[in-house]
């Protein structure tokens, strides 16, 4: 089993209008992490940048301009993917996992398309696997205990000690998501969570 754990930071909520500014994650094969990556990247020409996104990511327009060019990041990222699958074999693809993963899937696909690369589907199985939905299913008996379903809130509910200053960094968020998945898996989908667990570090 080949899994791509991935999280993106973006300049807004619309993959058509807005851009990608960080791509981070890990590839695991048969439950063993074989590669990790963390790319900071400049928005593509024409990508809109919202003030809210800048505030969330604690970054300025000038700092974004100093980041690596999208083309070079795209080439490095494709090299990583090609190291672990054969894009010419329709049965050899990566399962994409994340928290609210359809958001990241849509942005990543559009990011490639904006750079005239249309073979995204050669690498990734559709649909992506959303850890948020697994948590929602498992926690339905204790749903009223969750004040919201943001990653940080849910992680705390599962007893994960947060480094709140690192939330909205793609590398930290996907690390958090992987730990959350481990805890969901230990309980089993028919398990339940009705109250917050004592926090423990990642």
State the predicted function of each range.
Residues 3-7:
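Short, hydrophobic/glycine-enriched beta-strand segments
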Residues 8-16:
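Short acidic, Gly/Ser-rich segments with clustered Asp/Glu that frequently serve as metal-coordination loops
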């Amino acid at each position: 089993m080949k899994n791509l754990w991935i999280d993106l930071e973006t300049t807004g909520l619309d993959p058509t209008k807005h851009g990608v500014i960080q791509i981070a994650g890990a590839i695991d094969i048969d439950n063993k992490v074989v590669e990790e990556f963390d790319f900071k990247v400049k928005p593509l020409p024409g990508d809109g940048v919202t003030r809210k996104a800048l505030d969330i990511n604690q970054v300025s327009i000038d700092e974004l301009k100093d980041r690596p060019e999208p083309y070079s990041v795209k080439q490095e990222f494709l090299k990583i993917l090609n190291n672990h699958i054969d894009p010419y074999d329709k049965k050899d693809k990566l399962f994409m996992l994340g928290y609210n993963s359809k958001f990241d899937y849509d942005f990543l696909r559009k990011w490639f398309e904006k750079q005239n690369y249309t073979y995204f589907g050669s690498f990734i199985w559709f649909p992506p696997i959303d850890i948020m939905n697994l948590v929602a299913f498992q926690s339905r008996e204790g749903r009223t205990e969750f004040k919201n379903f943001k990653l940080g809130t849910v992680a705390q509910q599962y007893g994960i000690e947060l480094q709140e200053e690192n939330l909205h960094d793609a590398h930290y968020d996907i690390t958090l998501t992987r730990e959350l998945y481990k805890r969901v898996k230990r309980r089993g989908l028919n398990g339940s969570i009705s109250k917050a667990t004592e926090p423990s570090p990642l």
